[in-house]
Amino acid sequence: MANLLKTVVTGCSCPFLSNLGSCKVLPGKKNFLRAFHTHRILWCKAPVKPGIPYKQLTVGVPKEIFQNEKRVALSPAGVQALVKQGFNVVVESGAGEASKFSDDHYRAAGAQIQGAKEVLASDLVVKVRAPMLNPTLGIHEADLLKTSGTLISFIYPAQNPDLLNKLSKRNTTVLAMDQVPRVTIAQGYDALSSMANIAGYKAVVLAANHFGRFFTGQITAAGKVPPAKILIVGGGVAGLASAGAAKSMGAIVRGFDTRAAALEQFKSLGAEPLEVDLKESGEGQGGYAKEMSKEFIEAEMKLFAQQCKEVDILISTALIPGKKAPILFNKEMIESMKEGSVVVDLAAEAGGNFETTKPGELYVHKGITHIGYTDLPSRMATQASTLYSNNITKLLKAISPDKDNFYFEVKDDFDFGTMGHVIRGTVVMKDGQVIFPAPTPKNIPQGAPVKQKTVAELEAEKAATITPFRKTMTSASVYTAGLTGILGLGIAAPNLAFSQMVTTFGLAGIVGYHTVWGVTPALHSPLMSVTNAISGLTAVGGLVLMGGHLYPSTTSQGLAALATFISSVNIAGGFLVTQRMLDMFKRPTDPPEYNYLYLLPAGTFVGGYLASLYSGYNIEQIMYLGSGLCCVGALAGLSTQGTARLGNALGMIGVAGGLAATLGGLKPCPELLAQMSGAMALGGTIGLTIAKRIQISDLPQLVAAFHSLVGLAAVLTCIAEYIIEYPHFATDAAANLTKIVAYLGTYIGGVTFSGSLVAYGKLQGILKSAPLLLPGRHLLNAGLLAASVGGIIPFMMDPSFTTGITCLGSVSALSAVMGVTLTAAIGGADMPVVITVLNSYSGWALCAEGFLLNNNLLTIVGALIGSSGAILSYIMCVAMNRSLANVILGGYGTTSTAGGKPMEISGTHTEINLDNAIDMIREANSIIITPGYGLCAAKAQYPIADLVKMLSEQGKKVRFGIHPVAGRMPGQLNVLLAEAGVPYDIVLEMDEINHDFPDTDLVLVIGANDTVNSAAQEDPNSIIAGMPVLEVWKSKQVIVMKRSLGVGYAAVDNPIFYKPNTAMLLGDAKKTCDALQAKVRESYQK
């Protein structure tokens, strides 16, 4: 049956059977139906391909007849490509001779050699120049084209309407090579760019040939030869080709264009981009520049006039599609050039950019050589023909990708950047109908957004607006205010003792300023700890005011005893914690130390004083001087690791000498001395116990707690001093000064006390670390400040004791509340600044005690601590690019934040597992680890230290990069790493290591976010804009170890998570570090 059916089908002449395909015959599936379903086959038709088979088409390559035209449309290689595709190719005899392609080359490639008429009658004719009158044949080339044939050539349809009319009469389909859209997909067929590239290169070669000097500068025995200066106008393909060629020949190259992108390309080639002062975008359509405004052109002319007097060679390429080339250089400009200069006008064919250009000619005008050739590509005919041939063959394959038939479809509905766009833009005539210009494509991409200026650029612009006068005036105003204040203090001084105390305070502040700046950042934590211990000299104030016998007998004496007790906690605990931290920085290779020998100067200092006291000498002031100098030495000793332990020893000596001199000056009775000793001994024992048990990771909260003790001691001392001195106020000339200092010291101490307690609660986890933003908190704080300041009025005006003690009690309460509201509004990540500010407050409170008691030691030490805390606060704020007021008032945003909409982050992140991370670590030779607070919170320093040790033993260069505000107090991460045994010489600060990231194979970011956030540099609208950060993204590979992709404290998305060189290793930091350590150890043991 099947054979019968095939016979019927084969012999049937019925039309619906004529295209019968060889489909499979399908039998029925039910047993009782034994028929075949033949109707499916009877109606099946094979698809018919559109177009004409390549083997039926002939491509003709005529000889170019335009004057001096040496190019040919197809090279032998191009012919070979078309023959391989299936085309028949005929070439006019001698068509390629001027391009060094002989007829034999074409024959070898598979072409036939024929006459002009036969070639032009081909189905598809490819040319360089548009058809023109053939003088030899006496007929126009368009009239020799085959009816309904196809022409591919440069046409310039807007300038040649008569030619289009001739071609229309022949029903020709025309593809204009000059109309190929300048889109990414069409770069391989962009003949204009190919020819412009050659023209740009040739322009430099011709200029060098007619210029009388070297392009490159030389210093020879015969003398110095300056380099040639070249200005290139127009940053298109030709201009950039000229810039590259001229730069490679050693010339000084300058480039000008109205388009910002073109100027960037000039810069990338090593040329100096020139701009006018007027900002206006020159971006036009199709990759060309647009016509500019009158104001811009005037500024442009001014720039060109100036450049003409400086440069040796001018090359101009400026064109506007479909219009005459603009005149950019007038006659006066050209004549202002140095004799022997050269100008090359690549726009000569369109009229030229120079007023003095003669298109197609080379001539000299008043000593200036003018090159106005219109056939520069033709002067490199072989290269130009090869590139043009490649453009045509690629275009033919692209528009007709079918392997068998030549066919392309012209559509008026097409998307931007597609082949439909290329075909519709290139075809200017279809079957004799002019369809030029092409309609606007759909989905036209928006122009590139204006490049957002970086934070550094905006800062530079901002700095540039500050004139030298304004800068100097600001500086002069500061000095004027300072000197005026000093004069005011002198006038207000009640006695000589006050003036001497101000002198001591000023000099101590200057010494402290210069001393603290010398402290290495790695030792900022020990610095704060030692200043905390030294601030315990508030005990001196307590000792001076203590009284009674074995027990205090009055309220003031009780307050003084309590101040002495809590100050002693600070002294003992502070020095022991400092010693513990410094011992952690010791390396196994360090030489042995014999610090116990510093007992010798300590014994000499204190013992010598006791001996002199026993001998009847009163040298307390000299002892205070010696103690103060030792405290200065304590801070100075922390400038290096080698002298840090000496600094701690000097601090102990200074405090011990100060306490001894105080006791010696007081000469207490045995009972009172026992009371004093008991208070200090009990406080010291408690301080030592706390310091011995505290974990180093809990150091920030310990420092905060100790600061609260200093603040409380200052409040107690000031109130006690007021109570004791009150009976003498009526006869004391300095009574008002004493009252002012007592009031001020109480206020500072109250803020320090409560603020430190809140900071302790946040750091210890008792309170939430998130900022507590009370409604109207700024008004509340302003009210508290006004009430505190206003309270001094009745305090000074009313001489009664009740009013005075009430005012002191009120300011104590108000300042304590203000300390709470201020500190509660500050988030946990800003605690480094809070602690340093509180450290500074404690110093100023100590200064207030010094003025109150007329004690030089307290004034000197207070100035040291106050300046130390102030400088550390400044360092922290600079590290965040924020003002101190912004941090203290619980604000957000840096001083560089522009205030606009933040940059949107797009893209996807890459996640890896432990095995991937191990592979990356093993392959890297240079590794930088950048830890953040997450390392502290997870206590992952020990596995990281072990990992670093293993990697170092394998010969890898491993270092740490520490941000100044990483952690919860200055230098905390340095101490934690030292605790784990990491050598301090591989732990570098941000400024020391930032320049090394580009040469680093791998960066491990552990628990850090804001401190490595690239938005600080990339987004001027980010609230962390301008904040100095560790530039980890500049390394070759980055592994970020975090719990999640969540934001950091600043609540800013981090762009580095989505950068192509970043991999996210998500999970708990401690567990991940332990696993990394174990895996690395396992991999190296195999």
Swiss-Prot record:
Its EC number is 7.1.1.1. GO terms for cellular component: mitochondrial inner membrane. InterPro entries: Ala_DH/PNT_CS2, AlaDH/PNT_CS1, AlaDH/PNT_N, AlaDH/PNT_NAD(H)-bd, DHS-like_NAD/FAD-binding_dom, NAD(P)-bd_dom_sf, NADP_transhyd_a, NADP_transhyd_a_C. One of its GO terms (biological process) is NADPH regeneration. NADP(+) binds at residues 933, 965-970, 1007-1011, 1026-1027, 1042-1049, 1068-1069. The keyword NAD applies. It comes from the Eukaryota. PANTHER family: NAD(P) TRANSHYDROGENASE (PTHR10160), NAD(P) TRANSHYDROGENASE, MITOCHONDRIAL (PTHR10160:SF22). NCBIfam families: pntA (TIGR00561), PRK09424.1 (NF006942). This is NAD(P) transhydrogenase, mitochondrial. It comes from Ovis aries (Sheep).
